[in-house]
């Protein structure tokens, strides 16, 4: 717990400390509703959740950008669907990126750490993953973005594996043609060789529709909203988890940026499916 607090606290301090003239980024929060269905046990549950997130970026040299980000999320799914009373606890994720300008496009690398603890020390799941990413301008009003990463977990003493020895891909499209609104649609796919148990592969997918709309004169304060559908399958296990989410919140962009400018500068986040999938491992046990 002390290590967790130190890591997350350090990330948030760096983000808050970045709110100066030579940097840009955002801070925000959202609330939402998660509906989950365990097909194997025929359990259903819905729970509210809250998220706090932030990112800070700075230019490096003539063509580089460094981004640091942090996310903290908590939901209230009951132990009867999570399995064996292992209720979910606060989850968090931190990431770092370096992107390089190539004309109107950006190519880069990223590294991230996810932590999804539950009640009981034998059901805490952590993973490190990293890979390559890119943002490609297709027209003046549209862009596509993509990430491909490898991830691994070493959850000593856990009864299950989490996200062990796996790959994740993320592909999205953004529409920037509105004066004050950014819209994104994206898909995430992942497969790993140790999910619920060591010999059981994980087949994971998530689809999201996301938006941000400016509500003040310079679009620095935005309303955020989104919906997502995810499915988490462990081979050889009758349990399959389906999760649907809807959320609404706000973000404040600092450093003279806005949703669209921040996106074009490289603030695209990291894949969320690894953190989400580890949250449901005890349910598949």
Label each residue range with its predicted role.
Residues 24-26, 60-68, 102-109, 140-146, ...:
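Repeated loop/turn-to-beta-strand initiation elements of outer-membrane beta-barrel proteins
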Residues 21-80, 282-285:
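Short glycine/proline- and aromatic-enriched beta-strand/turn motifs that initiate or cap beta-hairpins
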Residues 1-21:
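Gram-negative bacterial Sec-dependent N-terminal signal peptides
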Residues 52-58, 94-100, 132-136, 171-175, ...:
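Residues on the lipid-exposed face of transmembrane beta-strands in outer-membrane beta-barrel proteins
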Residues 104, 123-196, 202-210:
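Detector for outer-membrane/organellar transmembrane beta-barrel domains
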